[in-house]
Amino acid sequence: MAGQKIRIRLKSYDHAGLDTSARKIVDTVTRAGATVVGPVPLPTEKNVVCVIRSPHKYKDSREHFEMRTHKRLIDIVDPTPKAVDSLMRLDLPADVNIEIKL
């Protein structure tokens, strides 16, 4: 797989679980003999929702909720077949969304 690059994007609402998953991916791929760039922190998406507290009136009384999506980017340069196989067998938490591009 010479000259290829694997790009892994991780997304999660929990930054601690995201960082441990990224560290686990980097350690696994490094042990398999591939070169790793990252994890690179990408900008955090912040989604804010405004809700009226009362069901009928009192429009001045509102409540704001926010949901933050944390993202990381990992590049694997010149992946070895052993590194790809170890990536496929890796067990990661369910709250981390993983996108892999070749």
Curated annotation (Swiss-Prot):
One of its GO terms (molecular function) is tRNA binding. One of its GO terms (biological process) is translation. Keywords: Ribonucleoprotein, Ribosomal protein. Pfam families: Ribosomal_S10. One of its GO terms (cellular component) is ribonucleoprotein complex. InterPro entries: Ribosomal_uS10 (IPR001848), Ribosomal_uS10_CS (IPR018268), Ribosomal_uS10_dom (IPR027486), Ribosomal_uS10_dom_sf (IPR036838). Involved in the binding of tRNA to the ribosomes. Belongs to the universal ribosomal protein uS10 family. NCBIfam families: PRK00596.1, rpsJ_bact. Part of the 30S ribosomal subunit. This is Small ribosomal subunit protein uS10. It comes from Leifsonia xyli subsp. xyli (strain CTCB07). The gene is rpsJ.
